Regions:
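Glycine- and other small-residue-rich loops at beta-strand/loop junctions that grip anionic moieties
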Residues: 177, 367-368, 402
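Short glycine/threonine-rich loop-to-helix capping motif typified by GTGT followed
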Residues: 377, 403-407
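Surface segments flanking catalytic/ligand-binding clefts of nucleic-acid enzymes
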Residues: 419
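Catalytic-core elements of nucleic-acid end-processing and repair enzymes
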Residues: 431
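Helical hairpin unit composed of two closely spaced alpha helices linked by a short loop
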Residues: 368-389, 394, 399
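N-terminal localization/anchoring segments of enzymes in phospholipid and broader phosphate metabolism
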Residues: 1-349, 353, 357, 381, ...
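Thr-Gly-centered strand-to-loop micro-motif
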Residues: 365-366, 423, 442-443
């Protein structure tokens, strides 16, 4: 009873209820007006047609256009208001301009190394094109690898995170989708408190919606009182707004501008298996050192400036260029981010490029598999061309409707020769792709529409780095403890289940 009362009085429940009431009010307003007035009803259908024409001409994926047009033309009283509140993944014009100014101000602090670009071009033209895709769209340059370390679990990563936090002398930047009370947060805060006492600058950004049920109500006040500068991204407010759909899904830790961490894990106990939710929680991440850390530092500073409405460029947190040792055997590394600010969907396009250009194999970890046409076609074409394409998704889901959508993608992929595995020990939250022993991405992006189009995400693109062998090794070990899905099992779904899957697939791009 106490837990039920806590949920009913929680910010998430109260704010969500107010938003739902507003949505119902808008639908009721449209409905009553259309019933009361034939003229309004006719105007509504004219508006639906005009809005559909507008959507056709927008810079948007065709399958997303079709989903919206179907909803708007079939149920205008629902589709039209829904589109204006939820139909635009990109930020509002005012927000876009402000964020664009900040991004443009920091871009010169990440200069390109033309000699390095040329070295990659002469080494592998496919890798060079993938690198240029990132640089041309996101202005994040290519770096020579200094040190990369892959972690195949949250526990493994946490040990390294604590060690790096203890070594901080100048600053610590942390940006996470979820920060939750528990053992993990307590151990981190113990270190941060000591560092603040010794003059280390500590800053934290967390996503308000992601952390809404996990973080203490007065977290910001508590942090500020001990000298930890804390900000929340996009506060979850009781009002319908386009921007409420855009979430900061990134997971970034930067220490002194010399080392950075990212991956699937947030700051909460389930990510290090101190709290069991869906069996064993498997996650993955990466630690990088060297000049490439400047990219993570500027990612954080851009978001910090945006939240603070600060237009100053804080280059004092960047390390000078060309100060890190680089061996001839080192590979190439390119951290970058993707956001609703752009129309180019760099993360998705890079995945498509890696899959399409693979010559031997492509192995993928993702908690959700809700694919757009481009990614689906790339996987199917690669598998039909004889490429060993394998995907691991959870056996135990965290969101049942999303899992039903994930399973709806199985059959066409398996029919084409893609091998799909269910991670039987529990829930796999890793977001990785590795191909041909030389190319990999580790980051925060799921293979679903929300990550690809709505969220702020971060990635590390790698070519021939030290840790790629370990990523492949982790994939092979994970296949061994997972259950492969065969074509026959995709038929064992009831009629009601298939109908629900079909409906979810139709509206998947809108969810």
């Amino acid at each position: 009873m106490r837990k039920i009362l806590q949920r009913l009085l929680s910010k998430l429940f109260i704010v969500s209820t107010i938003i739902i009431i507003q949505m119902i009010w808008w639908f009721f307003l449209f409905y009553t007006a259309s019933v009361a007035s034939r003229v309004f009803q006719d105007l509504l259908y004219v508006a639906a047609i005009l809005l559909s024409i507008y959507i056709v001409n927008r810079r948007m994926k065709m399958y997303i256009k079709m989903s919206w047009i179907f909803l708007i033309l079939s149920v205008p009283i629902v589709g039209i208001p829904c589109y204006f509140f939820f139909g635009r993944p990109e930020l509002t014009s005012k927000t876009q301009k402000r964020m664009a100014r900040i991004v443009e101000a920091y871009a010169p602090l990440r200069p390109e190394n033309e000699l390095l670009n040329e070295t990659l071009r002469l080494t592998d033209m496919d890798a060079y094109r993938q690198s240029r895709l990132i640089t041309q769209n996101q202005k994040y340059p290519l770096y020579a690898e200094d040190c990369t370390e892959y972690f195949k679990s949250g526990e493994e990563a946490f040990e390294s995170i604590l060690k790096d936090l203890r070594s901080a002398e100048k600053f610590i930047f942390m940006e996470y989708f979820i920060i939750g009370s528990g053992v993990m947060l307590d151990q981190i805060l113990d270190i941060l408190k000591e560092k603040v006492k010794h003059g280390v600058v500590v800053r934290i950004i967390y996503d308000d919606f992601g952390s809404i049920n996990a973080i203490p109500p007065h977290f910001i006040k508590e942090m500020e009182s001990i000298g930890i500068q804390t900000r929340r991204f996009n506060p979850y407010k009781p009002m319908l707004s386009v921007i409420m759909n855009d979430r900061d899904h990134r997971k970034i830790l930067v220490v002194d501008g010399r080392v950075a961490h990212t991956g699937g894990y947030n700051i909460a106990d389930e990510y290090i298996n101190k709290k069991i939710r869906f069996g064993y929680w498997k996650d993955a991440g990466i630690r990088v050192e060297g000049e490439c850390v400047n990219s993570f530092t500027t990612m954080f500073l851009e978001m910090w400036n945006y939240i603070n409405k600060d237009n100053a460029v804080h280059d004092e947190y960047l390390n000078p260029h060309n100060t890190f040792s680089q061996s001839e055997e080192s590979g190439f590394v390119q951290p970058f981010c993707d956001s609703p600010l752009e129309h180019d969907d760099v993360g998705e396009n890079l995945y498509v490029s890696i899959i399409s250009r693979a010559k031997k194999y492509v192995y993928i970890f993702t908690p959700y598999l809700i694919l757009g046409t481009e990614l689906s076609h790339a996987m199917i074409s690669a598998a039909r061309s004889g490429i060993d394409v394998r995907i691991v998704v959870p056996k135990i889901p965290d969101k049942k409707l999303i899992y039903l959508q994930t399973k709806a993608n199985f059959r066409p992929l398996i029919e084409a020769g893609v091998r799909i595995y269910l991670y039987t020990p529990g829930f796999i939250h890793s977001k990785c792709i590795v191909a041909d022993d030389d190319t990999a991405i580790v980051g925060t992006c799921n293979l679903d529409f929300r990550s690809m189009y709505w969220n702020f995400e971060d990635f590390v693109y790698m070519y021939r780095t030290q840790c790629i062998g370990k990523i492949k090794e982790d994939a092979i070990e994970t296949f061994a403890v997972s259950e492969e899905v065969y074509e026959e099992s995709t038929n064992d779904i009831s009629f009601a289940g298939r109908l629900l899957q079909s409906i979810l697939q139709l509206f998947a791009p809108l969810l």
